[in-house]
Amino acid sequence: MYLMNQNGWIEVICGSMFSGKSEELIRRIRRTQFAKQHAIVFKPCIDNRYSEEDVVSHNGLKVKAVPVSASKDIFNHVTEEMDVIAIDEVQFFDGDIVEVVQVLANRGYRVIVAGLDQDFRGLPFGQVPQLMAIAEHVTKLQAVCSECGSPASRTQRLIDGEPAAFDDPIILVGASESYEPRCRHCHAVPTKQR
């Protein structure tokens, strides 16, 4: 990261599932705590895989979080003494999340968001591409392909061990029972043109 002379900016952490997005978000939050900065973490209510009131990485790291149903609910919890606002699983938030993040950064907060940049079909996911475009810093993480060991930038959804079809619902909250990291070449979506 570069030294910022002004307060208020946006950082995006993105990548496939199992690439370490939540782990990196937690790492950054812990660093702010060592610096005696005030941080608050948000997560969408829909994300209840490991905990309803924590952001939890796949390897078990966790940090307390405020679950919210709508993007604009974040404003109800932010106070002036906050320095850092973090939002995990940002792809699950409604379309207002881009405006919310912009407003917070413009008010002088360091805003860190983490989420999937592609859905299980390999297409841009939710508002993450817009957030990447307006961010001062973007960190794109990769996992390791569960099939061949190459860098994995895609998320493979599995249903009964088989790749999910292109027209299956976009949102299905799950972990290793439903998803695997895959590279471009091992990623499969039946009925999708290659």
From Swiss-Prot:
Keywords, comma-separated and alphabetical: ATP-binding, Cytoplasm, DNA synthesis, Kinase, Metal-binding, Nucleotide-binding, Transferase, Zinc
GO-annotated biological processes: DNA biosynthetic process; thymidine metabolic process
Top class in the EC scheme: transferase
Domain of life: Bacteria
Pfam families according to UniProt: TK (PF00265)
Catalytic reaction(s) noted: thymidine + ATP = dTMP + ADP + H(+)
Subcellular location field: Cytoplasm
Catalytic residues (UniProt): E89 (proton acceptor)
Entry-linked InterPro entries: P-loop_NTPase, Thymidine_kinase, Thymidine_kinase_CS
Classification via Gene3D superfamilies: 3.30.60.20, P-loop containing nucleotide triphosphate hydrolases
GO cellular component: cytosol
UniProt-annotated binding residues for ATP: G15, S16, M17, F18, S19, G20, K21, S22, D88, E89, V90, Q91
Residues the record lists as binding Zn(2+): C145, C148, C183, C186
The protein's Enzyme Commission number: 2.7.1.21
Assembly and binders: Homotetramer.
Name this polypeptide is given: Thymidine kinase
Origin species: Bacillus mycoides (strain KBAB4)
